[in-house]
Amino acid sequence: MTEENQTVISQFLLLGLPIPSEHQHVFYALFLSMYLTTVLGNLIIIILIHLDSHLHTPMYLFLSNLSFSDLCFSSVTMPKLLQNMQSQVPSIPFAGCLTQLYFYLYFADLESFLLVAMAYDRYVAICFPLHYMSIMSPKLCVSLVVLSWVLTTFHAMLHTLLMARLSFCADNMIPHFFCDISPLLKLSCSDTHVNELVIFVMGGLVIVIPFVLIIVSYARVVASILKVPSVRGIHKIFSTCGSHLSVVSLFYGTIIGLYLCPSANNSTVKETVMAMMYTVVTPMLNPFIYSLRNRDMKEALIRVLCKKKITFCL
């Protein structure tokens, strides 16, 4: 074995985004504003749902968990990206890289499972309105949330442990803005066939199957409403399914295209842009799409503000 191959990598260099140096400050301000918008929007949702008893329903239980997941998902990558954009040496320790990978996978998987739970909730609400409260009991809702958190732990840990067993020799430059699976596998000088097989198999379980379940749920919603077509029914389809499906398509579409159907023609820049879509853009848009345009959330915000105002005056 050569001396080069015996070198142990203690840190990686995150090359970040291919942004010209003269535009760094502009993009730094843009990404900082996007991150702050994500944090503020999701925090507002979590706080409102906690404070307003009218929002203590299955739908908003899932939504509060989704908002927390979005907040954490974005926080796994964005602070490090912002730090590296201001640093001369954008490095990350090997242990820090594995930690970032674990939490990135954890919250990505959690979002996937929570989106399924939300789709099922809407399916029951529209197709079985008279039995909604009996089907979506508090016990079932809490069980779905807890199951989502537990399943993601095992999946994220599996990929992280498989990555930790690999050897990294001379090259330590990651052409990405965070420690993602694909660029790390390309840097490894070990056999990565097991990792790639697990990505394909487990990806089908935590990405493809949830995506199919969401599509099936909404297909049955549409079929149920079309049996008795009406303007109100069609409006319900668009108001209930449209926003959710747009985010689902953005989230799952980029992940499936990036990890499960990779193209040999995919450039590093293209992969980075796709990663930005679901790590930065989607968590930022979710509060606006799911809640801040929602009448219940607006009314809850008014009630909370009025209550605080009265308390302050007293």
UniProtKB/Swiss-Prot annotation:
Glycosylated residues in this chain: 5
PROSITE patterns reported in the protein's UniProt record: G_PROTEIN_RECEP_F1_1 (PS00237), G_PROTEIN_RECEP_F1_2 (PS50262)
Disulfide bonds: 97-189
Protein name: Olfactory receptor 1468
Pfam family name, one: 7tm_4
BP GO annotations: signal transduction
Extracellular side: 1-25, 80-100, 159-196, 261-272
